[in-house]
Amino acid sequence: MGYLHDAFSLKGKTALVTGPGTGIGQGIAKALAGAGADIIGTSHTSSLSETQQLVEQEGRIFTSFTLDMSKPEAIKDSAAELFENRQIDILVNNAGIIHREKAEDFPEENWQHVLNVNLNSLFILTQLAGRHMLKRGHGKIINIASLLSFQGGILVPAYTASKHAVAGLTKSFANEWAASGIQVNAIAPGYISTANTKPIRDDEKRNEDILKRIPAGRWGQADDIGGTAVFLASRASDYVNGHILAVDGGWLSR
């Protein structure tokens, strides 16, 4: 079928994508399905029916699975059973939340909520996936980091802390597992038009300032992340380990 098909095809693979109901997660699920992967999508509150339809339009199988990422200890048993019963070749740790508040007023419960979803549950799922991938000698793990894995941000101390930690964990897992055939990498999306970023886009002055700094001159779309995910999930990235790949329209280069 040629180099492109051989290097990027995900035919016969199964990907677990957390939080694929909308936005970046949905774009990734659709792209992976388009490359040939079946998708297991996890959610606790969001409907996955639209994502299921998009995956099935690509001729792939979509399975939904309930996980409450805000309760890391509670997901251990159900997630462990999932990894035991299904061969998951690709894990995409996409689920994430953000709370905005001045640092001096940031509620402790919001701090813990963000860390549980964005970091603690990610660690548990990665550890569980890694155990099975180590036995098979291959696997792909893709974490969703952020520009705030590199920068400090404004009004988002918990989110920034969690995304810095995700970048560090990505490198740490990669250092231990790369020699066993498991690639652990992260995508750091720039300013992507999703529900999470709506408050920023609604702020006319801040939106204008952001657009001025992005060399591409526009906000990214969820589909802009999909191709990167296919690359990191495929054989084409077999020698890429512990990398935080910014997909940001050039933001970090300016």
Curated annotation (Swiss-Prot):
Q: Which reaction does it catalyse?
A: 2-dehydro-3-deoxy-D-gluconate + NAD(+) = 3-deoxy-D-glycero-2,5-hexodiulosonate + NADH + H(+)
Q: Which GO terms describe its biological process?
A: pectin catabolic process
Print the keywords alphabetically.
NAD, Oxidoreductase
Upregulation details from the record are:
Induced by galacturonate and negatively regulated by the KdgR repressor. Is subject to catabolite repression by glucose involving the ccpA gene.
Q: Quick one: which pathway?
A: Glycan metabolism; pectin degradation; 2-dehydro-3-deoxy-D-gluconate from pectin: step 5/5
Q: Which residues bind substrate?
A: S146
Q: Does the keyword NAD apply?
A: yes
Q: According to the UniProt entry, what is the EC number of this protein? A: 1.1.1.127
Among InterPro entries, the record links this protein to: 2-deoxy-D-gluc_3_DH, NAD(P)-bd_dom_sf, Sc_DH/Rdtase_CS, SDR_fam
A Gene Ontology MF term for this entry?
oxidoreductase activity, acting on the CH-OH group of donors, NAD or NADP as acceptor
Q: Record's Gene3D superfamilies?
A: NAD(P)-binding Rossmann-like Domain (3.40.50.720)
* Residues that bind NAD(+): 16-40
What are the TM regions of this chain, as residue ranges? none
Q: What are the catalytic residues?
A: Y159 (proton acceptor)
Family named by the database record? Belongs to the short-chain dehydrogenases/reductases (SDR) family.
Job of this protein: Catalyzes the reduction of 2,5-diketo-3-deoxygluconate (DKII or 4,6-dihydroxy-2,5-dioxohexanoate) into 2-keto-3-deoxygluconate (KDG or 2-dehydro-3-deoxygluconate) with a concomitant oxidation of NADH.
- Write down what this protein is called: 2-dehydro-3-deoxy-D-gluconate 5-dehydrogenase
> In which organism is this protein found?
Bacillus subtilis (strain 168)
The gene name reads kduD
